[in-house]
Amino acid sequence: MPYIPLMQLQQLRYFTAVADTRHFTRAAEREHVAQPSLSQQIRSLERELGAELFHRARGHITLTDAGETLLPLARRILADAETARREVQDVAQLRRGRLRLGAPPSLCASLVPDVLSAFHATYPGVDLIVTENGSQDLVRALADGALDLALIITPLPVQAPALATSELLREELVVVSAPDRPAPVTGRRTRIHVEDLRGRPLAMFRRGYDLREFTTAACRTAGFEPTFTVEGGEMDAVLGFVRAGLGIAVVPSMVAERSGLRITPFATPGMHRVVSVAHRGDVSPSRAARELERILKEHLGLGPSAAPRPRPGPPRGPRGAVAGDRDRP
């Protein structure tokens, strides 16, 4: 293997300083170093390269042919090193960079926009890339390195040992229906039971999405299969189907409160889901990911070691209360 000189950036800085000033003492003053130290570094560089870089005549310093060859290369190396330092610092200090977040559609329609708005206000130079998908797909994307951070529903049906998770909140699920259609409960009842969903047309997400799996599991536990009349891949689509009277839907309370639809809570003990933030356990998250997680927990009123916060459901009130008739959060 050929010998490769181990030039140092400091040596190249000293070399360009002498080339600029044509004087060792003035070069040392410019670099804030003792003149003997600068001269020693130049001699060391010349030994590494196997060529003299300067003609040294008393009071007259000029570049040799080797020095003339090295000078533009040294300037380019120093400029590239400065660019690398600056760009890495920009990323490290979040002046620029990229953050890839994954979340289920229901959270993208409620929690995520507010949190990303707060993050962007603090770090406007960081590009935000959001992927909507079910928790299982998001976990796979984390494992493949396609995401930096994900909001998922836990516990997962299949263990993911390489995943580090932190619970954020326990959110209530409710039933939404069109305000101009009959309420899903009758008489004096203000709350719905899972059994009341038997035979009712449901608007729901397609297979693989958390809310569909959650609703299906609850119905099967109650002894029946849910009836899905229409399926969608986006929260806005499902809410639109409900608004058009195509069915009712089970959605998180955070989504329901913004929907303008009639909200009917489940009877005690209710239906809930746990939202957690996750990243790969074998890789340290980037500073951008750590900052987003901090802002997320701050938004939810959680400290570094706080337990997941229950998400309050719709307030008790008369049957058929419509979310749009209440103060928005």
Put a short name on every predicted segment.
Residues I4-L6, V91, D114-A118, S135-A178, ...:
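Short beta-strand-centered segments that line the small-molecule binding cleft or hinge
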Residues G102, L173-V174, R189-L211, H299-P304:
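Short loop->beta-strand "edge-of-pocket" segments that line small-molecule binding or catalytic clefts
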